[in-house]
Amino acid sequence: MTQPTDTPLERIASFTVDHTKLVPGLYYSRRDGDIITFDLRFKKPNTGDLLSNSELHSTEHLIATLLRNSPEKEAVIYFGPMGCQTGFYFLFDNRLLSCEGAIALLQEVFAAAADFSGEMPGKSPVECGNYSNLDVETGRRVCQFYADLIRDWTVEKLAY
């Protein structure tokens, strides 16, 4: 699709959030029909303190695997990193999982990931396009930080 030069592009929803005021936490980002997007913010934006590629990738493998193996797996649409390297997005079907349930699920899977033992899920050249930078200990450390952060999170705290 070619965008005419005289027509301004619509600003996407995530660009309407004032990133100068964001701090680490769990936020309700948007709703698209029955799909809710949560913003899982690990780092304060624009400070230079970013999640490394290994931290993002290792956390993604652990959390995506645990979410898709949870009793709520049918509600899970997507879990993945933000390009800005400050957090992740979690998309879920709100017909199958409430916001309260999603918070509880995230609290559970991050705590489980922090205690994860065994081999990193998907750590092989057949399963992953950059398997060599996956590290269980790195993922566990990042997940422990976030599990501690959201341990007492409630729906009332979801607002940006």
Regions found by a protein language model. Name each.
Residues 81-152:
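Active-site-adjacent, His/Asp/Glu-enriched structural segments that form or flank metal-binding
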Residues 35-68, 78-79:
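Active/ligand-binding-proximal structured segments within catalytic/core domains
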Residues 12, 35-36, 63, 77, ...:
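Weak global preference for isoleucine
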Residues 11, 30-31, 41, 68, ...:
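Arginine residue identity/basic-tract feature
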Residues 1-46, 155, 159-160:
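Non-catalytic terminal extensions that flank enzyme cores
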Residues 30, 79-80:
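A general structural signal for short secondary-structure junctions and capping/turn motifs
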Residues 70-73:
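Short secondary-structure junctions
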